């Protein structure tokens, strides 16, 4: 194969109690978030109000003031702003809401295709490009997100059937 990840042997961590594992996870995540907040440019956090981004925002808030941004689509049911706003109010973050209009999406397809340099059938490419541009325009140069926990913790149904998850 082109690439095969190295096999990791079980360590003594495999015998830790659930509480010890939870403590280790919390300490590790908190430290990683703290490290990613260190920058010489403004840092923001995309806050959907879901579990992933809310956990990252809560951990970041423990280290000081946090700027959060939530996205919504004009005239659409796909609007994360109310959920992000609720979490922001609970955590006391400096919050901004970003709206993406349908005409912005349609008008940006060609540009997004140029950046991707490939055919794509996922509108998320266009909206993600617009979202990050609006973050930049709002003065946020570094953006933390809450993506990845489903992959790490087996949050997708397909992962449960993959086997090996304990």
Descriptions of predicted regions:
Residues 6-166:
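ATP-dependent adenylate-handling active sites, centered on carboxylate activation for C-N bond formation
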Residues 1-5:
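Non-catalytic substrate-recognition/targeting regions of SAM-dependent transferases
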